[in-house]
A protein has these predicted regions:
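Transmembrane helix-loop junctions and nearby membrane-interface residues
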Residues: 75, 79-82, 114-117, 173
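Acidic, Ser/Thr/Gly/Pro-rich intrinsically disordered interaction regions
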Residues: 2-59, 128-250
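Phenylalanine-focused residue identity feature
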Residues: 78, 100-102, 203, 232
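Alpha-helical transition-metal enzyme core signature, strongest for iron centers
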Residues: 65, 69-72, 100, 104, ...
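A glycine-rich, hydrophobic loop/mini-helix early in the fold
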Residues: 58-90
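Amphipathic alpha-helical interface elements
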Residues: 84-124
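Short low-complexity stretches enriched in small and charged residues
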Residues: 23-28, 59-71, 116-127
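Short coil/turn segments at secondary-structure boundaries
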Residues: 49-52, 56-59, 63, 91, ...
Length: 250
C-alpha cells in the first residue's frame, strides 16, 4: 500500500499530517519536549539525538510549506469573495493576485529547502544552498525525489516571469484588468456594458485559477513527501537500532 493511501484522518489537507512523516513524529515530539523544558532558561542549545534534530529540521520545513499553502487558501477565499462583491475593486484584486504569485514561487523555494533538510545539506556561510545546487545534489543522490521536486517546480513555473516582473519592473496586469482599471480610473462612460459584471467575471476566473493551482501544488508536494519517505524510514530505523543496542549494553 502506498504512503498516500494511509494518510492520517485528522486534517488530511495539512502536509504535516502526511503518512510519510509518521516515522519521524516520535523523534520530533521528543525534540520538542526537550526544547520546551528550556523555555525561559536562557539556554538555546537543545541536547538532542541526531534523529531528533533531523526530525525537527524536516518537520519544521514541512510546517513552512503548510503555512504557504494556508496563505494561498486565504488568497483564494478573498478573491472568491471579491468576485461576489457588489462593488468589485480591480486594485484589491491586483493586490491579492500579486500575493498569490509571490506565494506560489515561495512554495517552490520552500520545497527545495525541505529537500535540503532531508538530504542533510549543510549551510554555506550561514545561508542555505540555492535551488540549483539543491537540484544538482538530489539528482545525484535520489532520482525519485529529484523528479518529484521538479514536478513541484513545473506546477507554478508559469508564474516565475510575472513574479520577477513584480519584483523588478511593474505591478501585475493583464489586458482585461488593464482595460477595466483604465475605464474606472478615467470614469469613462461605459453605456451598454455592465462594468461590475465584467469585473466579477474576471475575478471569478482568477479565483478558479488560484483554486486549481492550490490543488495541484498540494498534490505535488504530497508526492514529494512520499518520494522522501524511504529516506525518513532509514533515519527512524537507525535510531531504533541504536536505542536497542544501548539498552542491550545497559
Amino acid at each position: 500500500m502506498s504512503v498516500e493511501a494511509s494518510k492520517i484522518e485528522c486534517c488530511p489537507e495539512l502536509l504535516g499530517n502526511h503518512a510519510a512523516l509518521l516515522c519521524l513524529l516520535p523523534h520530533q515530539r521528543s525534540y520538542l519536549h526537550r526544547a520546551l523544558a528550556l523555555v525561559g532558561t536562557g539556554t538555546r542549545l537543545v541536547k538532542a539525538s541526531a534523529a531528533e534534530v533531523y526530525a525537527q529540521s524536516v518537520c519544521s520545513r514541512v510546517a513552512e510549506l503548510d503555512n504557504g499553502l494556508g496563505s494561498l487558501r486565504l488568497v483564494q477565499r478573498f478573491v472568491g469573495a471579491l468576485a461576489n462583491d457588489s462593488d468589485p475593486d480591480p486594485d484589491i484584486y491586483r493586490y491579492h493576485y500579486e500575493n498569490f504569485v509571490f506565494r506560489c514561487i515561495g512554495l517552490v523555494d520552500r520545497a527545495h529547502l525541505l529537500v535540503a533538510a532531508a538530504l542533510l545539506m549543510s549551510k554555506k556561510r550561514g545561508n542555505m544552498p540555492d535551488n540549483h545546487l539543491i537540484e544538482g545534489q538530489v539528482k545525484n543522490r535520489n532520482a525519485g525525489v529529484h523528479a518529484a521536486l521538479l514536478e513541484v517546480k513545473a506546477t507554478v513555473q508559469l508564474y516565475r516571469r510575472p513574479r520577477n516582473e513584480l519584483v523588478h519592473a511593474s505591478a501585475y496586469s493583464c489586458r482585461d484588468l488593464g482595460v477595466l482599471g483604465g475605464v474606472l480610473y478615467l470614469d469613462l462612460n461605459a453605456e451598454g456594458v455592465d462594468i461590475e459584471a465584467v469585473a466579477r467575471a474576471l475575478f471569478s476566473e482568477g479565483s478558479n485559477e488560484i483554486a486549481t493551482t492550490l490543488e495541484a501544488l498540494t498534490l505535488k508536494l504530497g508526492a514529494l513527501l512520499e518520494a522522501m519517505h524511504p529516506m525518513f524510514e532509514l533515519v527512524a530505523k537507525a535510531a531504533t537500532k541504536k536505542a536497542a543496542s544501548k539498552e542491550a549494553v545497559e
